[in-house]
């Protein structure tokens, strides 16, 4: 089965690579329109997936990721339309020169070819990834989680119908609908057909891909994100950022999971934090230095377990640790962070600059929420993933991250001397 999918995707990629920006945008507009026109089919399929997942004991954070509403589906369609409005990087001349021989040399952006994406209970990923791949002239093979099998099947059927109505092969966007996990291992060895693999899921999935894949893998998306509260912070303003970073949508990978508080401001900051977190329904997981003071406040507080510093809660839970100074905070982030998104809240710009220079994450913020790490917020449109590695892309992966380049030499029957 996968062999045939790979052949179809590779053949489709050759046709996609020849499309103009206008032709690709016409396809995307058709997909967006059809997602809205066929919304009832997609939402009914999703309702069945959610019901099964709830019956099987899936946690609330994952159920939130899985669930589609009419508003969310409309937002997904609107995201596709936003991709239409983005500049197409394919064909862009990155740089060029004329050599002494007279050969005119250009480095030009081209599609990667076929992208493979493995993800879990995130039905929006199906459309986000497909739209970005099509915009950049890439075919894509999707493998969603078993929890989203009906939703993904319905969504991909809509996309394929839109492709065919525009004269393009359905093989441009395909989904593996068999939940057999052995197919994941088989997919990881499809280097004959797939040019880049992107896993979007937990640490176990990323480890599996790194160990078994014969295809170049882009890893990331696991967000153990930190905010360091410096001693010079403006408490009221800092709390607004923390509430946003923790509560706006707790199930996302750019949500803060650990708050590092400078010991010199703890006495004034912790009571205010407790009050604010109580109002927001956040459970605080406090270290020994913060526990007693936080327990005196209104927030729900438990003693933090050492392993929780490495946890991506994806829920209304927040670690709180007292640190001696900026060096202590940076050391903690280096040990427990996932190089996703980390922030400092401070009025001391020297400390801010040190934090930016010394915290080696894909996105580092000064006096801002970690929630900004998002393709849409960065002006990239829908993102295919957030990469926490350094090759071939880093941070939110937009259109350029789905391209490579080729060298093109144009001569007049020019020969090398």
UniProtKB/Swiss-Prot annotation:
Chief place where the protein resides: cytoplasm
GO function term, MF aspect, one: glutamate-5-semialdehyde dehydrogenase activity
InterPro entries, per database record: Ald_DH/histidinol_DH, Ald_DH_C, Ald_DH_N, Aldehyde_DH_dom, G-glutamylP_reductase_CS, Glu-5-SA_DH, GPR_dom
One protein family per Pfam: Aldedh
Keywords linked to the UniProt accession: Amino-acid biosynthesis, Cytoplasm, NADP, Oxidoreductase, Proline biosynthesis
Protein's cellular compartments: Cytoplasm
Annotated EC: 1.2.1.41
UniProt superkingdom: Bacteria
Residue ranges crossing the lipid bilayer per the database entry: none
Role summary: Catalyzes the NADPH-dependent reduction of L-glutamate 5-phosphate into L-glutamate 5-semialdehyde and phosphate. The product spontaneously undergoes cyclization to form 1-pyrroline-5-carboxylate.
PANTHER family assigned to the protein according to its UniProt record, in alphabetical order: DELTA-1-PYRROLINE-5-CARBOXYLATE SYNTHASE, GLUTAMATE SEMIALDEHYDE DEHYDROGENASE
Record family assignment: Belongs to the gamma-glutamyl phosphate reductase family.
Protein's name in the database: Gamma-glutamyl phosphate reductase
Lineage: Bacteria, Pseudomonadati, Pseudomonadota, Gammaproteobacteria, Enterobacterales
Gene encoding the protein: proA
